[in-house]
Amino acid sequence: MYLPQEIIRKKRDGEALTADEINFFIQGVANNTVSEGQIAAFAMTIFFNEMTMPERIALTCAMRDSGMVIDWSHMNFGGPIVDKHSTGGVGDVTSLMLGPMVAACGGFVPMISGRGLGHTGGTLDKLEAIPGYNITPSNDVFGQVTKEAGVAIIGQTGDLAPADKRVYATRDITATVDNISLITASILSKKLAAGLESLVMDVKVGSGAFMPTYEASEELAKSIVAVANGAGTKTTAILTDMNQVLASSAGNAVEVREAVRFLKGEYRNPRLLEVTMASCAEMLVLGKLAENTEDARAKLMEVLDNGKAAECFGKMVAGLGGPVDFMDNYDNYLDKAEIIKPVYAKETGVVSAMDTRAIGMAVVAMGGGRRVATDSIDYAVGFDQFIRLGEIASSEKPLAMIHARNEAQWQEAANALQAAIKVGGEYTPTPDVYRQIRQEDI
């Protein structure tokens, strides 16, 4: 028998907690015998004293086990259960292509995704731009669609990692969000409760990333790989660039449109293709569906080009309540804004930098994201046909197309983009994918 305040005192004094102490505290969080004040104090002691790797693993497992942990064994999928998670960015629509691509190669991807957070877009918000798409199916339907389509992307249910919900809500209002131990446990407790065999973590770097520096992103990636493997789930991470919008679009319906066009081979943004392929290839190698990265990439290009990946996406949409003919008639189903016109730079010159975070906030300001949890989303608004870093902005080459509801909204968005995209000065190229981090690299 432990006392929450004694566990807090021990951590406050810089000592390492045992797995039993951490389990006791997190069970108390889940059953409400630990108060919000105690959660806040616990989070702050971790913020100042950090956790050892065994403590991080114990915290992650305790939060994972605070609710239901899905067991897929009765489904007899007949292939590896794999998933990926991204720390989030702007125009990061990779999940919508990645799930079907891996499914078409023989993997099973039961993906539990989130909504937009701050400046980052949410996979669920994008999918809800598809009429009828149900992000909260029963567990039976979730499993059935995963089995039939190879992929199902849904929202977090209340019975997965409930302790994380309480801890996160308290961290959000006590300035303890940006701590590697707490971020690691929060991300992984939800993901590992979904019954995965392996996981690929896409950690973003740059002006639109969650972590402020390359070093912080690398530290988070290493923590996630070490903790997830320690908790029994094979995991690797990739560090990818978020110094500019990843896709050619940012918003909800505009990103779904780009994802469908990507899967059908109508248009594939080269950066989006590279980052998506990097994550998918890791998933195939981890799931033993490919010998190595080269083999994986060849298989992935094949399912993109022969239409099998697009077919898996269509099956998922139909299985979760969306239109059965969505892939053929997607443009008729996705909401469109009344005003779609370009914005130009105020001067001609090379695009040398993007404040990607500010571009994400411009989407939110238009109604394409939430300022508070109760806000509703306008699926039609956003941007597409983005200029890339290193390209020349001119009277012929706009910064982007703005999808707005009215002229005033268009003007506000135009001002935001002109301020966020720097024209002129030195442009230093950055790689799309910086590096992979595997267990043996730590």
UniProtKB/Swiss-Prot annotation:
Catalyzed chemical reaction(s): thymidine + phosphate = 2-deoxy-alpha-D-ribose 1-phosphate + thymine
Annotated PROSITE patterns: THYMID_PHOSPHORYLASE (PS00647)
Pfam families given in the database record: Glycos_trans_3N, Glycos_transf_3, PYNP_C
Pathway: Pyrimidine metabolism; dTMP biosynthesis via salvage pathway; dTMP from thymine: step 1/2
Catalytic EC class: transferase
InterPro entries on file: Glycosyl_Trfase_fam3, Glycosyl_Trfase_fam3_N_dom, Glycosyl_Trfase_fam3_N_dom_sf, Nuc_phospho_transferase, PYNP-like_C_sf, PYNP_C, Pyrmidine_PPas_bac/euk, Pyrmidine_PPase_CS
Keyword line: Glycosyltransferase, Transferase
GO cellular component, one term: cytosol
GO MF entries: 1,4-alpha-oligoglucan phosphorylase activity; thymidine phosphorylase activity
NCBIfam families (alphabetical): PRK05820.1, T_phosphoryl, Y_phosphoryl
Family designation: Belongs to the thymidine/pyrimidine-nucleoside phosphorylase family.
Subunit structure: Homodimer.
HAMAP family (alphabetical): Thymid_phosp
Known function: The enzymes which catalyze the reversible phosphorolysis of pyrimidine nucleosides are involved in the degradation of these compounds and in their utilization as carbon and energy sources, or in the rescue of pyrimidine bases for nucleotide synthesis.
Protein name from the UniProt record: Thymidine phosphorylase
Provenance organism: Vibrio vulnificus (strain YJ016)
